C-alpha cells in the first residue's frame, strides 16, 4: 500500500485522508504528474490553458 500526501484545496492543510479532517472537503494529491518527454496530452493541456487565460495563438 502506497500513501500519497494530499492537500485540501479550501483550507490548504495536508493529510493522508480522502477528505479533509478540518473542513470535510475532498482532498487532492499534492504531487505533480510524472514528467515524460513524449507527453501524449501536452498539446491539449497547453491549448486548454491558453483558452482559460484568454491568450490568442498567432
Curated annotation (Swiss-Prot):
Q: What keywords tag this UniProt record? A: Ribonucleoprotein, Ribosome biogenesis, rRNA processing
Instruction: Give the superkingdom in one word.
Output: Archaea
**Classification via Pfam families:** Nop10p
User: Keyword Protein biosynthesis, does the record have it?
Assistant: no
InterPro entries associated with the record: H/ACA_rnp_Nop10, H/ACA_rnp_Nop10_sf, Nop10_arc-typ
- SUPFAM superfamilies referenced in this protein's UniProt entry, alphabetically: Nop10-like SnoRNP
Example of a GO biological process term: rRNA processing
Q: Which family does the UniProt entry place this protein in?
A: Belongs to the NOP10 family.
General function of this protein = Involved in ribosome biogenesis; more specifically in 18S rRNA pseudouridylation and in cleavage of pre-rRNA.
Protein name, per record = Ribosome biogenesis protein Nop10
Q: What is the protein's species of origin? A: Thermococcus onnurineus (strain NA1)
Its gene is nop10
